[in-house]
UniProtKB/Swiss-Prot annotation:
Core component of nucleosome. Nucleosomes wrap and compact DNA into chromatin, limiting DNA accessibility to the cellular machineries which require DNA as a template. Histones thereby play a central role in transcription regulation, DNA repair, DNA replication and chromosomal stability. DNA accessibility is regulated via a complex set of post-translational modifications of histones, also called histone code, and nucleosome remodeling. Keywords: Acetylation, Antibiotic, Antimicrobial, Chromosome, DNA-binding, Methylation, Nucleosome core, Nucleus. The nucleosome is a histone octamer containing two molecules each of H2A, H2B, H3 and H4 assembled in one H3-H4 heterotetramer and two H2A-H2B heterodimers. The octamer wraps approximately 147 bp of DNA. The keyword Cell membrane does not apply. This is Histone H4. The lineage of its organism: Eukaryota, Metazoa, Ecdysozoa, Arthropoda, Crustacea. It comes from Penaeus vannamei (Whiteleg shrimp). The modification N-acetylthreonine is found at T2.
């Protein structure tokens, strides 16, 4: 007996965290050089200084929509873990098909 009593959770099965760290200002993690690299990959030569904040805003809205759809697929399947296929289907729904992740 491990001394956990009835209904004790096994290893790695901890309950929900009581205090969750509030995530804010993480969009600044998309750095100026990262946006510049993406633009270079797209064939851009010179970039205006105002582009960086605008790109962060557009990316945030896009990811919010994709994540919302992926979580909807997960909840419909009565799962708690978002799979790669949920994200693929969410992207496909927003007409941006992604290859190489199954399906």
């Amino acid at each position: 007996m491990t001394g956990r009593g009835k209904g004790g959770k096994g290893l790695g099965k901890g309950g929900a965290k009581r205090h969750r760290k509030v995530l804010r200002d993480n969009i600044q993690g998309i750095t100026k050089p990262a946006i510049r690299r993406l633009a270079r990959r797209g064939g851009v030569k010179r970039i205006s200084g105002l582009i960086y904040e605008e790109t962060r805003g557009v990316l945030k809205v896009f990811l919010e929509n994709v994540i919302r759809d992926a979580v909807t697929y997960t909840e419909h399947a009565k799962r708690k873990t978002v799979t790669a296929m949920d994200v693929v289907y969410a992207l496909k729904r927003x007409x941006x098909t992604l290859y190489g992740f199954g399906g």
